[in-house]
Amino acid sequence: MPDTELEIEYSQAVRDHRAAHSRLVMLLRRMAMESLGDVVPGASSIAAVGEFNEDGIPTLRIQRVFDAEGRVLFDVDVGHSDREVEDAVDFVDTEYVDVLIDLAPGDYFGSVVID
């Protein structure tokens, strides 16, 4: 049986891990929005879809980017005439948004909104 000191240390480590996890999720969401905001002025929210890809790996992919009034600024099905926008969406997908589904799969499968 673990001694009391070990149980206390373990409990603290669990609390620290949960706090760090929550902070990382919040920072990933902010990084995604601010990165898109650099190339899509007025970007306020992202509509994304979380699913398993053909290799069985969970992915979260941006479908649309909206402004604060709900107007579509980017739609993956339409694309964008500015290659910088397309590149930014691809970067945000792999560097920030995909990490969200790894960290909290229950929150990011199916249709989700990130703001």
Question: Language model features by range: what are they?
Answer:
Residues 3, 7, 52-115:
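Detector for the mature cores of small, proteolytically processed
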Residues 3-43:
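Contiguous, amphipathic alpha-helical segments that mediate oligomerization or scaffolding
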Residues 41-51:
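A contiguous, surface-oriented mixed alpha/beta subdomain in the mid-to-C-terminal portion of proteins
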